[in-house]
Amino acid sequence: MRRIIKILVVVAVLYLAIIFLFANTRRVVPIHRQTPFPPTHPADLKIHDPSILKVGDKYYSYSVGPRIVIHEAPTLSGPWKKTGHVLDKDSIIPKGDRKAPWAPTTIEVAGTYYCYYAVSQSGCRNSAIGVATSQSPGPGGWTDHGAIIHTGTGPGSDSAPFDRSNAIDASVILTPDGNGYLNFGSYWTGIWQVPLNADLVSISDVSTNAARHLAYEPHAFSPGGKNPNPLCGDRSGSHPIEGAFVSYRAPFYYLWFSWGKCCKYNPKALPPRGKEYQIRVGRSTHPQGPFVDRQGVDLIEGGGEVVYGSNRDVYAPGGQGVLTDEGTDILYYHYLNKTVSLDFWEARLGYNPLIYIDGWPVAQ
């Protein structure tokens, strides 16, 4: 009997010890991962690097393609219809792919529409960001103002930060007090920001401009290249971060970006799982940062909270933006459907409403 009692006592002590151990062990929260991701809300639109506005009861999308393609739809899901182009001829910026400008972002301010776009050459940072304006969101009536900034070559390209960055993937955040900031950057030294003048189509003298470094991926995904052209191929290696977009929901500004390998996927040699395109975010109480993730890691140090990534048939979502529609923030992006094709031009529009938990966006 005493032996049985001793055994029961030992068991009870062990049980209590286990409870105490778990009660005093901090729950480990995985960094950079929100799992599982919800399914996408698909749309009937093939698109890459979308920019979406809602004007009245109609949605407008702007995307890479000849002279910047415009589509219109009654709902985000569609049906989407191509209605024309932003530019009526090639960009007036004399460099890069002038016929099909990249990654446009369109905003509306006081009845004027501003479409920011990039001209560049794949794998090189001989790039520029330009802007066109119109009094209407649809095709026709746009004025091309040309370049705001240059990298690689062109006016101001030898001044910091343009001497080390890549002027593509433009977006603009307009603060409640009316100040505009141009966000840009891809690979190389990551994402940068410069303040715009009040006209929103120019910046101050670059030699005195108050530029901010917002985000960077410090770890190279691949070795540096040996391209004889110093503007093509980063000799420090591939640092895949791009596609900056800043949204605001009081009291925070949110810096969204695409991280990981983008585009030109070989189905037989895909990047390691988790290294493909995904959508990350950091936040700040100031539009110029510093931006940090949930763990407090500065985005310049490689921080970033994953909000949406590959799941189910969705592969490599990115090129994102945030649209506020009837009080709800909606994360939209392009993605590839693994059951259809991984070809660049098979990317399609997807979206997810956002909720905020402890001030952090969560895709629904």
From Swiss-Prot:
Principal subcellular localization: secreted
GO terms (BP aspect): arabinan catabolic process; xylan catabolic process
Subcellular location(s) per record: Secreted
Entry keyword annotation includes Methyltransferase: no
Keyword Hydrolase assigned: yes
SUPFAM superfamilies: Arabinanase/levansucrase/invertase (SSF75005)
EC number of the protein: 3.2.1.99
Keyword field: Carbohydrate metabolism, Glycoprotein, Glycosidase, Hydrolase, Polysaccharide degradation, Secreted, Signal, Xylan degradation
InterPro entries xrefs: GH43_arabinanases, Glyco_hydro_43, Glyco_hydro_43_endo_a_Ara-ase, Glyco_hydro_beta-prop_sf
GO cellular component, one term: extracellular region
Chain's role: Endo-1,5-alpha-L-arabinanase involved in degradation of pectin. Its preferred substrate is linear 1,5-alpha-L-arabinan.
Protein known as: Probable arabinan endo-1,5-alpha-L-arabinosidase B
Organism (species): Aspergillus terreus (strain NIH 2624 / FGSC A1156)
Lineage, highest ranks first: Eukaryota, Fungi, Dikarya, Ascomycota, Pezizomycotina
Gene it is expressed from: abnB
